[in-house]
UniProtKB/Swiss-Prot annotation:
Cross-referenced SUPFAM superfamilies: Cystine-knot cytokines (SSF57501)
Region (Straightjacket domain): 30-74
Name of the molecule in the record: Transforming growth factor beta-1 proprotein
Glycosylation: residue positions: 82, 136, 176
Residue ranges, annotated region (Arm domain): 75-271
PROSITE patterns the record matches: TGF_BETA_1, TGF_BETA_2
Organism: Chlorocebus aethiops (Green monkey)
Motif extent (Cell attachment site): 244-246
Length: 390
């Protein structure tokens, strides 16, 4: 080595040691998604919501409030809004099934309706208008130990002969012994028995998540405004409508039942652990200091943030947004430079790494006026519930 090189060696040694001791930067910390200022993201999210609300209501501009009557909202309108809000809250509380669970074969179980000598039936007035069907949730949990394992639930009823056309409605027992409408069916006259099936997957997931012991449904004749006869004409196996309002004794194994399709119990632990690893939802993100992709809190006050006074309920809501880097799954020594170069050539404005985007969104019920008429509307996909890298 020339003398000049020897003189430089003491200066080069610290640099060489620094290169040796410093680990190569893993690709897991890299993302080609541009880093955006948090306040800028919030402002953009607010402006996006402004446009979304007007677009979903098909309004070119906020409606005039000149004709809005003074005072509080009418009680009927407020009751409709509250019931809509409660229904949305109940549905959003339901656990989401995991895509991985759809791969596995489903175990099918039948849970029969509770027999009518159970005291639960004494709490409901016997009527020619309706029949009641209650189920023991302990039997449901024995068949499906975790709500996330439930793939599908059907309420099956064996309809007997029907002489006249009958419009029926199915309701779910709700809080304070109230009833929530689920669906309806128009039954044609028939001389032969026929199985009726109602999809009640969401309802059964709610039951599995709650601590109640007995839950139930009500099948009722449709109440027509121009008809005085609201008698339930259809006979369901296991009941006799009685025409006198009497609930007859249940008979046979073909009484109403729930057909449950669920992923087997032995896979529950695997799916549950996978769910915790993947769930970038509000429960996880709001209680952690996660720096990567996650749901970020954002409350929008309609008056303060949007300058709007025309939305009367709610006054604001938690819109939230997704933010955070989505790491590469490759390491630096396994990246295919030619593939990435070709990708960037054909997609110069795109990211070579996934970006943080919404996965689950919830609706937002609102009350607003059009002229002097109050309206209750449900705006879809307004609340970010969870995020994913995509």
């Amino acid at each position: 080595m020339p003398p000049s090189g020897l003189r430089l060696l003491p200066l080069l040694l610290p640099l060489l040691w620094l290169l040796v001791l410093t680990p190569s930067r893993p690709a897991a910390g890299l993302s080609t998604c541009k880093t955006i200022d948090m306040e800028l993201v919030k402002r953009k999210r607010i402006e996006t919501i402004r446009g979304q609300i007007l677009s979903k209501l098909r309004l070119a501009s906020p409606p005039s409030q000149g004709e809005v009557p003074p005072g509080p909202l009418p009680e009927a309108v407020l009751a409709l809004y509250n019931s809509t809000r409660d229904r949305v809250a109940g549905e959003s509380a339901e656990p989401e099934p995991e895509p991985e669970a759809d791969y596995y074969a489903k175990e099918v179980t039948r849970v029969l309706m509770v027999e009518t000598h159970n005291e639960i039936y004494d709490k409901f007035k016997q009527s020619t208008h309706s029949i009641y069907m209650f189920f023991n949730t302990s039997e449901l949990r024995e068949a499906v130990p975790e709500p996330v394992l439930l793939s599908r639930a059907e309420l099956r009823l064996l309809r007997l002969k029907l002489k006249v056309e009958q419009h029926v409605e199915l309701y779910q027992k709700y809080s304070n012994n109230s009833w929530r409408y689920l669906s309806n069916r128009l039954l044609a006259p028939s001389n032969s028995p026929e199985w009726l099936s109602f999809d009640v997957t969401g309802v059964v997931r709610q039951w599995l998540s709650r601590g109640g012991e007995i839950e139930g449904f009500r099948l009722s004749a449709h109440c027509s405004c121009d008809s005085k006869d609201n008698t339930l004409q259809v006979d369901i196996n296991g009941f006799t409508t009685g025409r006198r309002g009497d609930l007859a004794t249940i008979h046979g194994m073909n009484r109403p039942f729930l057909l449950l399709m669920a992923t087997p119990l032995e896979r529950a632990q695997h799916l549950q652990s996978s769910r915790h690893r993947r769930a970038l939802d509000t429960n996880y993100c709001f209680s952690s200091t996660e720096k990567n992709c996650c749901v970020r809190q954002l409350y929008i006050d309609f008056r303060k943030d949007l300058g709007w006074k025309w939305i009367h309920e709610p006054k604001g809501y938690h819109a939230n947004f997704c933010l955070g880097p989505c790491p590469y799954i490759w390491s630096l020594d396994t990246q295919y430079s030619k593939v990435l170069a070709l990708y960037n050539q054909h997609n110069p404005g795109a990211s070579a790494a996934p970006c943080c985007v919404p996965q689950a969104l919830e609706p937002l019920p609102i009350v607003y006026y059009v002229g002097r008429k109050p309206k209750v509307e449900q705006l879809s996909n307004m609340i970010v519930r969870s995020c994913k890298c995509s």
